[in-house]
Swiss-Prot record:
Pfam families assigned to the protein according to its UniProt record, in alphabetical order: PRA-PH (PF01503)
Reaction catalysed by this enzyme: 1-(5-phospho-beta-D-ribosyl)-ATP + H2O = 1-(5-phospho-beta-D-ribosyl)-5'-AMP + diphosphate + H(+)
Listed EC numbers: 3.6.1.31
The protein's enzyme class: hydrolase
PANTHER family linked to this entry: HISTIDINE BIOSYNTHESIS BIFUNCTIONAL PROTEIN (PTHR42945), HISTIDINE BIOSYNTHESIS BIFUNCTIONAL PROTEIN HIS7 (PTHR42945:SF1)
Keywords: Amino-acid biosynthesis, ATP-binding, Cytoplasm, Histidine biosynthesis, Hydrolase, Nucleotide-binding
Name used for this protein in its record: Phosphoribosyl-ATP pyrophosphatase
CDD domains named among the record's database cross-references: NTP-PPase_HisIE_like
Gene3D superfamilies on file: MazG-like
Compartment list: Cytoplasm
Length: 103
């Protein structure tokens, strides 16, 4: 199991937890829209660090993006396995061809 899979499992386990007991549970309690908003905020922070060129800060913000992506997905009952299956299906396909196939 990868660290991302372990994190996804931890996020999923927090869905029913007391919001006072964990940040993840608190996000879930605020609803999927708030989870999506927080993901967007973290993505913007990662973009800023990418533009600035600070590798360590970008890596840290990217970790936050991955965490908040998992929370947002879980809030809508989409699993990491589902996302990985989409990536696997796209593997080996030209990005241009794949995008054209979406219609």
């Amino acid at each position: 199991m990868t660290v991302l899979e372990r994190l996804a499992a931890t996020v999923e386990a927090r869905k029913g937890a007391d919001p006072d007991s964990s940040w993840t549970a608190k996000l879930f309690a605020k609803g999927p829209e708030k989870c999506a908003e927080k993901f967007g905020e973290e993505a913007v922070e990662a973009i800023i660090e990418a533009v600035r060129g600070d590798r360590a800060k970008l890596a840290s913000e990217a970790a936050d993006v991955l965490y908040h992506l998992l929370v947002m997905l879980a809030a809508r009952d989409v699993t990491l396995a589902e996302v990985m299956a989409v990536l696997e299906a796209r593997e080996g396909t030209s990005g241009i061809a794949e995008k054209a196939g979406r219609g």
